[in-house]
């Protein structure tokens, strides 16, 4: 398979120097040739576009190790004093972290939630959130699946969910503050890839003493990261269940993402609102929209679908920011498990050698990552000799069905955990 074209990163910062925001260095050994990395992890971007830090200017000499504090939305976002076994979101400082690009985060911070069986006393399950999600899987977006007696049974398993690298809910990302400048990274935050996000998950798991996982599962971007978590440590995960996630990003999705990033670059937060509206149209299905909105108008004559999209756009503005959204979308567009591994089949042979099982879950009517893309991954896994199965969620909800179809998800995950 060909590597996926990446979105060109907009490295200029309007109104102030990117250098004033820079808080990280570049690891020359890991970076190697920027031109070589640009041809694989960042195809489609010129080396001159990427810069020595891929979207940021390195700190001045002598300031290569600067600790960054987090810029939380509120003090309640992360309770760093909480017991990690109590189900509260906690933060963990994980030290120096080198990205694929060679850029360095001097002090990676991870926010996570752990529920259920204590670490070290039983099997652990990793749940990975999607694009704008958080570590609060058990208390929020997957709550119907996690808990005593649920399919992800906290009486039998420990359930851990970490906020993704580059996000804004406690883990290092664009809103993290540099203690020297007192300002957030913003656009100067270095580019991250899905593999960087997977490696950050392992950094946290290692720090917590979790060496093996019974299951890694996630939807959309979370499914992509779950795949890379498995490939990063073949043999450490028994089963991987990526939901609505292919082996590589599809070109239609890259095109949609590019439009969103262009909107943000040109219009800032107004662009983010429009980007979210566009994204929502890819998360649902034609059937869902027709059933909910056909023939409906608001009191002022506005079509109800338009009012709905405006509402969704405004909702995201209340809890997100343009730099974080850009960082996460760009990371998603680097997804390709076959990159620098000889293709998808060769990559999946690494998992087959350790007996890792794979369940690829497609969603009926998903226009973002179609069922054909998930089937293609399972065909590659079968060719690689993996114990692989395809399952499908039947729904009118489109891509976001992995956030609402609880009964079908329960059936699929029950099978995966056998």
Please report, for each region that a protein language model flagged, where it lies by residue.
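Conserved hydrolase catalytic core segment
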Residues: 212-248
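Catalytic active-site module of serine/aspartate enzymes centered on a nucleophile-bearing elbow/loop
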Residues: 384-418
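Catalytic-loop region of hydrolases
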Residues: 2-13, 42, 51-124
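Short beta-strand/loop motif that positions the catalytic acidic residue
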Residues: 360-362
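Alpha/beta-hydrolase-fold enzymes
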Residues: 236-315
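Conserved acidic catalytic loop of the alpha/beta-hydrolase fold
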Residues: 184, 188, 195-214
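N-terminal cap/lid subdomain of alpha/beta-hydrolase-fold enzymes
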Residues: 113-178
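Conserved alpha/beta-hydrolase "acid-adjacent" motif
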Residues: 367-373
């Amino acid at each position: 398979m060909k590597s996926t074209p990446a979105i060109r990163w907009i490295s200029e910062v309007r109104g102030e120097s990117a250098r004033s925001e820079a808080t990280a260095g570049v690891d020359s050994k890991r970076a190697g040739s920027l031109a070589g990395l640009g041809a694989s992890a960042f195809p489609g971007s010129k080396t001159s576009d990427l810069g020595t830090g891929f979207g940021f200017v390195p700190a001045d000499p002598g300031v290569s190790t600067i600790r960054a504090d987090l810029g939380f939305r509120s003090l309640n976002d992360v309770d760093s004093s909480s017991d990690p076994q109590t189900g509260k979101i906690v933060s963990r400082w994980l030290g120096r972290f080198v990205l694929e690009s060679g850029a360095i985060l001097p002090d990676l911070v991870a926010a996570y939630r752990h529920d259920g069986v204590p670490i070290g006393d039983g099997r652990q399950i990793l749940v990975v959130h999607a694009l704008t999600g958080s570590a609060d899987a058990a208390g929020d977006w997957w709550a119907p699946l996690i808990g005593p007696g649920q399919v992800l049974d906290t009486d039998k398993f420990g359930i851990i969910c970490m906020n993704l690298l580059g996000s804004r809910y406690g883990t290092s990302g664009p809103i993290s503050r540099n203690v020297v400048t007192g300002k957030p990274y913003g656009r100067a935050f270095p580019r991250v890839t899905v593999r960087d996000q997977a490696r950050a998950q392992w950094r946290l798991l290692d720090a917590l003493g979790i060496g093996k996982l019974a299951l890694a599962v996630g939807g959309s971007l979370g499914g992509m990261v779950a795949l890379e978590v498995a490939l990063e440590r073949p043999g450490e995960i028994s089963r991987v269940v990526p939901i609505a996630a292919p082996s590589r990003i599809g070109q239609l999705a890259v095109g949609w993402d590019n439009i969103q990033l262009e909107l943000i670059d040109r219009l800032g937060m107004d662009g983010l609102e429009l980007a979210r509206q566009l994204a929502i149209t890819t998360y649902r299905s034609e059937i869902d929209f027709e059933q909910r909105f056909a023939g409906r108008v608001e009191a002022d004559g506005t079509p109800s679908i338009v009012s709905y999209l405006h509402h969704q756009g405004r909702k995201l503005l209340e809890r997100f920011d343009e730099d974080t959204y850009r960082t996460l979308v760009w990371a998603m567009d680097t997804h390709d498990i076959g990159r620098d591994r000889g293709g998808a089949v060769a990559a999946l042979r690494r998992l087959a050698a350790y007996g890792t099982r794979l369940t690829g879950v497609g969603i009926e009517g998903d226009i973002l990552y179609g069922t054909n893309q998930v089937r293609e991954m399972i065909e590659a896994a079968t060719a690689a000799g993996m114990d692989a199965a395809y399952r499908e969620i039947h729904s009118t909800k489109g891509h976001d069905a992995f956030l609402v179809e609880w009964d079908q998800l329960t059936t699929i995950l029950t099978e995966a955990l056998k």
